[in-house]
Curated annotation (Swiss-Prot):
B6-vitamer kinase involved in the salvage pathway of pyridoxal 5'-phosphate (PLP). Catalyzes the phosphorylation of pyridoxine (PN), pyridoxal (PL), and pyridoxamine (PM), forming their respective 5'-phosphorylated esters, i.e. PNP, PLP and PMP. This is Pyridoxine/pyridoxal/pyridoxamine kinase. GO terms for biological process: pyridoxal 5'-phosphate salvage. Homodimer. The keyword ATP-binding applies. The keyword ATP-binding applies. Substrate binds at residues 23, 59, 233. It comes from Escherichia coli O139:H28 (strain E24377A / ETEC). Mg(2+) binds at residues 136, 162. It catalyses: pyridoxal + ATP = pyridoxal 5'-phosphate + ADP + H(+); pyridoxine + ATP = pyridoxine 5'-phosphate + ADP + H(+); pyridoxamine + ATP = pyridoxamine 5'-phosphate + ADP + H(+).
Length: 283
C-alpha cells in the first residue's frame, strides 16, 4: 500500500475521547504533561493541544519557552478535523491558556465543533491565579474567559481566587463562595466545582464544593502540606475521566480528590519535586 493512500484513508484515523487544551512542559508534571498520562491510565484516548510550551515551570532557576503562536494554535485544532480524528470525541478540557487570542480561537473552534457533537462535554479550568500569588496570567485573560469560554462550558473548576475574579464577588467564606458559583450557572453551565475552598485548618482538611442549580455538596479531604505543582491539572484530568467513565458528578469529584492525594503521597515517598503517577487501582 502506498504511503499516499495510507495517510489519506480517513477510516484509519486515530480517534480521541478527549481533547485536552493546556500547557505542556519538557521537564515536569504540570498541564498536559501530567493530564495526558493520567487520562490514559483511565483507558481513554486523548489528544493534547499545547497553549504554551515551556522547559519547566518558572519555579526553577532557569526557564525557557512561551506561548504557542496563534497561527500554530489554530492549526493544531484545525488539523484534528482535517485528519478526521474527532468522530468519537466526547469531551474537551481546557487549562492554562497562553493568550486571550487563544481563548477566542478555541471558542470559535468549539462553537463549530458542537454542530457535529451536540452532546460534547466542555470542562474549563479557568487558570487565572490564586490567593497567595494573585493574578499570574496576562491581565486580559479573565475577561476572555468570561466572554468566550464560560458561555460554552458545561462545567468549570475555579479555585476561590478565580471564582472571585470571574464573578467580582467576595468568596472567602463558604456561603459567599456558593452564592458566587450559583451566579455563574446558566442553561449551558450546569455545575461549578470550587477547588481549594475554605477548609478546617485545625483538622487539616480542605474542601471541594460541587455547586449545581439544585444541589450543593461539600467534599472534605485531608490536607497535604506540599509545594508540588500540577495537582489542579491532575484533579481535572481525573474528574473528566471519571465523568466519561459514567461516574456521577459528586462521585467523580470525590474520586478525583482521593487520587490526587494518593499521587501526592506517592510522590513524597519517592522524594520527587515533580508528581509521579502510581498505578491506578481498579474502582
Amino acid at each position: 500500500m502506498s504511503s499516499l493512500l495510507l495517510f489519506n484513508d480517513k477510516s484509519r484515523a486515530l480517534q480521541a475521547d478527549i481533547v485536552a487544551v493546556q500547557s505542556q512542559v519538557v521537564y515536569g508534571s504540570v498541564g498536559n504533561s501530567i493530564a495526558v498520562p493520567a487520562i490514559k491510565q483511565n483507558g481513554l484516548n486523548v489528544f493534547a493541544v499545547p497553549t504554551v510550551l515551556l522547559s519547566n515551570t518558572p519555579h526553577y532557576d532557569t526557564f525557557y519557552g512561551g506561548a504557542i503562536p496563534d497561527e500554530w494554535f489554530s492549526g493544531y485544532l484545525r488539523a484534528l478535523q482535517e485528519r478526521d480524528a474527532l468522530r468519537q470525541l466526547r469531551a474537551v478540557t481546557t487549562g492554562y491558556m497562553g493568550t486571550a487570542s487563544q481563548i477566542k480561537i478555541l471558542a470559535e473552534w468549539l462553537t463549530a465543533l458542537r454542530k457535529d457533537h451536540p452532546d460534547l462535554l466542555i470542562m474549563v479550568d479557568p487558570v487565572i491565579g490564586d490567593i497567595d500569588s494573585g493574578i499570574y496570567v496576562k491581565p486580559d485573560l479573565p475577561e476572555a474567559y468570561r466572554q468566550y469560554l464560560l458561555p460554552l462550558a458545561q462545567g468549570i473548576t475555579p479555585n476561590i481566587f478565580e471564582l472571585e475574579i470571574l464573578t467580582g464577588k467576595n468568596c472567602r467564606d463558604l456561603d459567599s463562595a456558593i452564592a458566587a458559583a450559583k451566579s455563574l450557572l446558566s442553561d449551558t453551565l450546569k455545575w461549578v466545582v470550587i477547588t481549594s475552598a475554605s477548609g478546617n485548618e485545625e483538622n487539616q482538611e480542605m474542601q471541594v464544593v460541587v455547586v449545581s442549580a439544585d444541589s450543593v455538596n461539600v467534599i472534605s479531604h485531608s490536607r497535604v502540606k506540599t509545594d508540588l505543582k500540577g495537582t489542579g491539572d491532575l484533579f481535572c484530568a481525573q474528574l473528566i475521566s471519571g465523568l466519561l467513565k459514567g461516574k456521577a458528578l459528586n462521585d467523580a469529584v470525590h474520586r478525583a480528590g482521593l487520587r490526587v492525594l494518593e499521587v501526592m503521597r506517592y510522590t513524597q515517598q519517592h522524594e520527587s519535586d515533580e508528581l509521579i503517577l502510581p498505578p491506578l487501582a481498579e474502582a
